[in-house]
Amino acid sequence: MKNEIIQSALRNLKIKELNPMQKASLEQAAGRKDVILLSPTGSGKTLAYLLPLLLTLKPNDDSVQVLILVPSRELALQIDSVFKAMGTPWKTCCCYGGHPIAEEKKSIVGNHPAIIIGTPGRITDHLSKGNFNPETIETLIIDEFDKSLEFGFHDEMAEIITQLPGLKKRILLSATDAEEIPEFTGLNRTVKLDFLSDASEEQGARLKLMKVLSPSKDKIDTLYNLLCTLGSSSSIVFCNHRDAVDRVHQLLADKKLSAERFHGGMEQPDRERALYKFRNGSCHVLISTDLAARGLDIPEVGHIVHYHLPVNEEAFTHRN
């Protein structure tokens, strides 16, 4: 019966075969051990932990059974969308900043979700208000763990764990081997699945790096000419700051080059609209901070342009 649930979910997602990382995770994450899964952004980690949940979620149970912590609103919504597309009987609720907390509470109380997906700050708010019972949660998943640390969510995540007395299992997913990982596992024996080295070799074979030299005063002109050369191929242009995204977007607009911008200072509907247009191909250029590098499912990106160099190797890994 349980295998039928997995097969049905895969059919609904139109996925014929899992990749090696997903197969390994399905085997280990459904067991009793804690799991650390190290794999690059965009490698399919979402399925790697959602599928095993189908083997452990209790049917006909109105309590919250699983908590998934993520660093961004977009990732929360993406995970929610994937789970809903599986066509299972269990319900979910997304909780994140910028969304009315009263609506989230109403959804939790009225819909009885088995899974709550949220950012650490908003989950902390719900717990402080007693909006759901944390004692029934048996599985904690932290996706994009390294990015959550980078965002300064260490203390919130640690505090949330102290409020989950019924916790039986933890799953941590990260695109880098962050040194803080052991702090958040160890509830049970821990299995570490490391697919970073394999993916690094694959990425090295897949990526072609090109350096474009330009004086600072000509940088926008150089970017404009490069994007014109790339034509209709989809491109993400990464900047290190929100104001830089806005400035580059406006300067390209002045040159009649159509692009969307994407950063954490934008209103949520505007961010969702920008991602939607980029994903469906109606816009070929997305100018973004590293927010677009945080586990978002953006298929078939042809080119990554580092308008500003990434601040460290981890940022480079996430962007690419």
Model-identified regions with their sequence ranges:
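Conserved helicase RecA-like core
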Residues: 1-320
